[in-house]
A protein has these predicted regions:
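Short helix-boundary/capping micro-motifs
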Residues: 11-28
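A short LG(V/I)-centered, amphipathic sequence patch enriched
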Residues: 40-59
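Hydrophobic hinge/microswitch elements
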Residues: 128-133, 137-140, 146-147, 196-250
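Short beta-strand->loop
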Residues: 155-165, 239, 247-261
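Secondary-structure junction motif
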Residues: 188-209, 272-279, 289-290
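A late-sequence structural motif
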Residues: 251-292
């Protein structure tokens, strides 16, 4: 069927190779390659450049990609409507999220959902806010769990307030505070996390008319925690990013408090039953997780 060949082409573009696309689709590598070649032969155009360095889209492939992606999405939605009519809890939910959510929320949430509706599968892509925003607009994912830009084309509902916490070495002078005023950080080297959510922190600091001199900039929460543990400086991280490393350092909330807002975001109103089930159950499962901590 042509739709199967469309899926093979789309998966190859998204995965970057026939081998990875084959793993996603549960086909052999040669079968995926052949389906893409069949499309090229059927249409009389080259869709992919095949080089030793990897696969890239040709101009024709780039021009046709949005249409092929739309057809695959429409076919998935059609199946969803049919499943809704017959009452079947089946389908695929495509999620895009940030690292902290993928590490701390999704294992527990997806385990419970798969017990409740074993016929539903989940695909999880991990990226930063800008990338997830693009995935939603390109229809590569159904749901985003992140902090979106202000965009009227996306539906966003607040899901969680992730509190920013000051982290510092054990035995540090800041440990005398129950809540740390920002002015107290000006006396210590500050390590900045170079992530997109830092803009939200920066906006909060500007609103409070506070400025913290940055001494170091790096990425990766674990790297920052290890630098802080070694006495290199202090930092501010969202609480979710500290879950696995909080025993290594001390932490306190800010005074006044600041939060990273995490939203559940969709592009339009979801119609597929599997996506509806995920959106309906997610808030309750997160509340249950919070009570169990």
């Amino acid at each position: 069927m042509t739709i199967t060949k469309f899926r093979a082409f789309l998966a190859t573009v998204e995965c970057g190779s026939f081998t990875e696309a084959a793993k996603r689709l549960y086909y052999t590598q040669s079968a995926v390659s052949r389906m893409v070649s069949d499309l090229e032969g059927q249409w009389g155009v080259a869709l992919l450049n095949r080089k030793k360095t990897g696969l890239t889209l040709t101009p024709a492939g780039a021009a046709l990609l949005p249409y092929i992606r739309q057809i695959c999405s429409d076919e998935m939605r059609l199946n969803g409507v049919l499943q809704d009519m017959t009452g079947l809890k089946q389908g695929v939910v495509r999620l895009g999220t940030v690292t902290a959510v993928a590490n701390e929320w999704l294992p527990i949430v997806l385990k419970k959902l798969m017990q409740e509706a074993p016929g539903i599968e989940y695909e999880v892509l991990i990226g930063n806010g800008d990338v997830i925003d693009d995935w939603l607009k390109e229809d590569r994912i159904d749901v985003g769990l992140f902090t979106p830009k202000c965009d009227g084309n996306l539906n966003a509902e607040l899901l969680h307030l992730d509190e920013f916490r000051v982290i510092f070495p054990k035995g540090h002078p800041l440990s005398k505070y129950k809540k740390i005023p920002l002015r107290a950080l000006q006396d210590y080297p500050y390590i900045l996390h170079g992530a997109s959510w830092c803009k939200e922190l920066e906006n909060g600091l500007k609103h409070g008319k506070q400025r913290i001199p940055v001494r170091y900039t790096t990425v990766g929460a674990t790297s920052i925690v290890n630098l802080v543990k070694a006495g290199i400086g202090v930092s501010i991280l969202p609480e979710l990013l500290l879950e696995n490393d909080k025993a290594k350092v001390e932490s306190r909330p800010l005074d006044p408090p600041l939060y990273r807002k995490l939203f559940v975001v969709t592009h339009g109103t979801p119609t597929m039953p599997a996506v509806k089930i995920f959106l309906e159950r997610l808030p309750a499962l997160l509340k249950k997780r919070a009570k169990q901590r």
